[in-house]
Amino acid sequence: GVTVSTGLELGPDSDENTGGQWIKAGGTGRNTTVTANGRQIVQAGGTASDTVIRDGGGQSLNGLAVNTTLDNRGEQWVHGGGKAAGTIINQDGYQTIKHGGLATGTIVNTGAEGGPESENVSSGQMVGGTAESTTINKNGRQVIWSSGMARDTLIYAGGDQTVHGEAHNTRLEGGNQYVHNGGTATETLINRDGWQVIKEGGTAAHTTINQKGKLQVNAGGKASDVTQNTGGALVTSTAATVTGTNRLGAFSVVAGKADNVVLENGGRLDVLSGHTATNTRVDDGGTLDVRNGGAATTVSMGNGGVLLADSGAAVSGTRSDGTAFRIGGGQADALMLEKGSSFTLNAGDTATDTTVNGGLFTARGGTLAGTTTLNNGAILTLSGKTVNNDTLTIREGDALLQGGSLTGNGSVEKSGSGTLTVSNTTLTQKAVNLNEGTLTLNDSTVTTDVIAQRGTAL
């Protein structure tokens, strides 16, 4: 085969260049190697096959190129009317498909080495024309410009697609798709570990989320006719627009109102101030975050579901054990905070019969009423003065009480094995009863009697 090392002296893909290898209409070039400063020009009606372009060499294409390999800064420029079939883009290789150009069956192995959607436009595949049946592997990236369109793209883990134009029939097998302002994605299939992100001004239609796939719709983004199958994750807020079906039936997030949303396996719904959510199902791995001034009613918390809220929100529903709970009007009743959950009690508000199972309970003042229970892994953080006139119970396992002060005529009861650590806290209670386990004080003051039973440790 021929080796070409001239033709780029006046810049990449410049019409001012006159050197290099020219393949004219009816001509064919086979097994050519294009190296540094080299250029192969395939004119309309010409064909190049099995070309290797490396070390900064380039191929300018108005005709047909088949099975081109781009290595180490090798570049391929597909002009209007040109077609590239079966191109392989290896590390630091670069393919540009200009308006009217077509690339089919491209394999992209470069462009995303800097991480997901990093600012890297010097390698990978850039689509201003049309790209069909592209495979994007680990470290591969396809960028679809506003004038570009991609069809039937397959993206594996570690690869990604950035959409400013149109993307149709994309399949995410662990890969990522980012749809930007003005971009459109249709018929995207999100399988395990795949991730589709619809940014502000971006749109998606007919996305399907399968087990452990994730659709994220940012504020100002829109996704319509979504199919969320069991185990698929939806991440969004009430500032986005999302419609579709899930295992409960039809769901929607429109104009600040969410209805019938299912959250699991990394799914999350943020209910913003002044917005509402109804009939939300929060299962294992799902998170419902209700901001101060937001409202969520008929919430169903499953095992492993996470609730984030403060006493300025309005939330009501049932816990994983079937017990009704409520937050509203400065009062929280019967909350159960599982691992990852968090509730903040604001000054002047009251929390009654709160159970913390590995979650975080923060009291910025306010009052603890009824029985407050800390189970294994629970954290109660005090800020300022919090009043407890009833019972704070620490059961089996380890728990942490930290910061601020706990005052009032209530009691602290430690039962079951494990350690209650009190750190940087002032305890002023009627009594501290150490029935089982260990009480550890770190930079804390206890201004009450501590009654320690035999076999306990202080």
Question: What would you call each of these model-derived segments?
Answer:
Residues 1-458:
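Beta-strand-rich extracellular passenger or scaffold domains
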